[in-house]
Amino acid sequence: MSLDRSLLLDDARRLYADAPRALRFKQRLRVLACPFEETIGYVPEGASVLDIGCGSGLMLGLMAARGKRVQGHGFDPCPVAIGLAGRMAVRLRDSGSTLRFEHRDARSPWPARSYDVVHMQDVIHHVPIPAQRAVFDRACAAVRPGGLLVYADMSARPLWRNAACRIHDLIVAREWIHPVPITTIEDWAAENRLALEVSRTAHRVIYGNDLRVFQRRLWP
């Protein structure tokens, strides 16, 4: 079930109230650009959640603010973002959720454990091409039996939305990104024995998103 996006915008403003103005604006822009109101709905209450490339911890913070009572673990290669995530988590210490963030590159070794939900939003296109498959395979391996991989990334069509995403990353991330076709992502997931459960476009404002939810079956 989708959430009211206006509630998430209010949450983002409150969770990062002490951040610099530019970073506060960035968190609210993420709520407008990403289908968080949908992806949060796929997360069961009390779930263990791994957020790969978590940035400033927004996704896990929104889950906690919406009463999901998750055990959240996020990592990101940007130390400034992780510092902001840690300060945000302090505001949620009485939410019933446990949030932990660490500075880690997705290409480095990951914790050897599995999760109820693994989340990837706008991550793969930032990973160098030679490492993209390995990072995705690690994400799949972290999904426990019965668990979900919630994946969202920029869509290839329509072209003007794709261009908007590319320009955004040139301005904000200062890099030329390397998206993986969504059909390739579906093939990689199938090779990792994950079944496709949800397949839809989730366009927001000028940004295009391909949203996929995969599940690891309880049986082979």
Residue ranges and their predicted role:
Residues 1-19:
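N-terminal, positively charged/glycine-rich alpha-helical extensions of SAM-dependent methyltransferases
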Residues 14-33:
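Class I SAM-dependent methyltransferase Rossmann-like catalytic core
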Residues 29-45:
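Conserved alpha-helix/loop element of class I SAM-dependent methyltransferases that forms part
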Residues 47-55:
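Conserved class I S-adenosyl-L-methionine
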Residues 58, 62-107:
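Class I SAM-dependent methyltransferase SAM/SAH-binding core
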Residues 119:
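A conserved beta-strand element that flanks and buttresses the S-adenosyl-L-methionine
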Residues 133-145:
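A short glycine-rich, Lys/Arg-flanked "PGG" loop and its adjoining helix->strand segment in the class I
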Residues 152-192, 198-204:
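C-terminal alpha-helical "lid/dimerization" subdomain adjacent to the S-adenosyl-L-methionine
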